[in-house]
């Protein structure tokens, strides 16, 4: 395992102003998602959704704590370009765990952004690697590089037959859900093939950015085998949420402010069923982040 770089050692390896710009986009992605309202079952500006243990302010504090760690993921990605990509993840883990600890300190123990630390950590490390190798930094190359980092991850961590199964292992064995690991190892297909093109198309049509993002969240909810939902509601809860999101999309989705009433109703139903599509929220963060990548001129 390579050591984690602490201080810049070479200006060509540590383009700090660029790293800070990309990190700022990732931080803004987390804030954009949590402030987006109304979201079914999720914490937003209006209520706490199906969560009784967290509030909007927890997410704001969490995002701020994570923000300082994001450039370090990039630094590590840039520092280990001689490693094969599948060997990078082992060196990222200590950074991810330290970032998680900072999140838990900021939220007094509430898990607000653990999934985003995983996905944004991978993407930020991919940025560092691609920048150092002078390769294009696009949504496609970032997702492909993240997939290379995670090669074999699902088999290693979900297919084990431990005496004490983790929540992820249990959902994999019972329902075949691979969660955040599987999505990352596959190169974020729900984002690259579905959510990102959908979001970009709505913006190109002149749609309101917030309404476009809410509609994109519905699309993710309709397609994603969300382990957050399945852990709360089982296969029946997941099927219901996917089908209801699909129904709203077939009815036209979220195109005007008048359509927000359907999201308010959906939110109330999620609260009653104790369902929270946190995995889809994490993928929405990835979607928004990748949609903004071209803003950084490198």
Swiss-Prot record:
<dbReference type="InterPro" id="IPR002736">
    <property type="entry name" value="CitG"/>
</dbReference>
<dbReference type="GO" id="GO:0046917">
    <property type="term" value="F:triphosphoribosyl-dephospho-CoA synthase activity"/>
</dbReference>
<dbReference type="GO" id="GO:0051191">
    <property type="term" value="P:prosthetic group biosynthetic process"/>
</dbReference>
<dbReference type="GO" id="GO:0005524">
    <property type="term" value="F:ATP binding"/>
</dbReference>
<comment type="similarity">
    <text>Belongs to the CitG/MdcB family.</text>
</comment>
<keyword id="KW-0808">Transferase</keyword>
<keyword id="KW-0067">ATP-binding</keyword>
<protein>
    <recommendedName>
        <fullName>Probable 2-(5''-triphosphoribosyl)-3'-dephosphocoenzyme-A synthase</fullName>
        <ecNumber>2.4.2.52</ecNumber>
    </recommendedName>
</protein>
<dbReference type="Pfam" id="PF01874">
    <property type="entry name" value="CitG"/>
</dbReference>
<dbReference type="InterPro" id="IPR017551">
    <property type="entry name" value="TriPribosyl-deP-CoA_syn_CitG"/>
</dbReference>
<keyword id="KW-0547">Nucleotide-binding</keyword>
């Amino acid at each position: 395992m390579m050591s984690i770089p602490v201080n810049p050692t070479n200006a060509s390896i540590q383009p700090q102003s660029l790293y800070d710009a990309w990190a700022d986009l990732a931080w803004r992605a987390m804030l954009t998602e949590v402030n987006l309202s109304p979201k079914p079952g999720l914490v937003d500006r209006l209520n706490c959704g199906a969560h009784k243990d967290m509030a909007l302010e927890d997410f704001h504090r969490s995002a701020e704590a994570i923000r300082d760690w994001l450039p370090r993921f990039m630094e590590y990605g840039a520092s280990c370009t001689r490693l094969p990509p599948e060997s990078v993840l082992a060196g990222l883990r200590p950074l991810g765990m330290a970032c998680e600890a900072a999140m838990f300190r900021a939220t007094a123990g509430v898990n607000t952004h653990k999934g985003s630390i995983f996905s944004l950590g991978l993407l930020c490390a991919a940025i560092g690697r691609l920048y150092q190798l002078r390769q294009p930094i696009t949504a496609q190359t970032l997702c492909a590089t993240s997939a290379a980092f995670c090669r074999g991850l699902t088999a290693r961590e979900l297919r084990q037959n431990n005496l004490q199964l983790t929540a992820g292992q249990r959902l994999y064995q019972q329902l075949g859900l691979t969660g955040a690991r599987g999505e990352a190892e596959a190169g974020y297909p729900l984002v690259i093939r579905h959510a990102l093109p959908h979001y970009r198309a709505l913006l190109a049509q002149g749609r309101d950015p917030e309404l476009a993002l809410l509609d994109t969240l519905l699309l993710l909810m309709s397609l994603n085998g969300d382990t957050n939902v399945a852990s709360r509601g089982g296969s029946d809860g997941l099927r219901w949420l996917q089908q209801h999101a699909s129904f709203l999309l077939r009815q036209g989705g979220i195109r005007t402010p008048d359509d927000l009433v359907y999201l308010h109703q959906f939110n109330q139903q999620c609260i009653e069923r104790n369902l929270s599509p946190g995995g889809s929220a994490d993928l929405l963060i990835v979607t928004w982040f990748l949609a903004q990548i071209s803003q950084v001129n490198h």
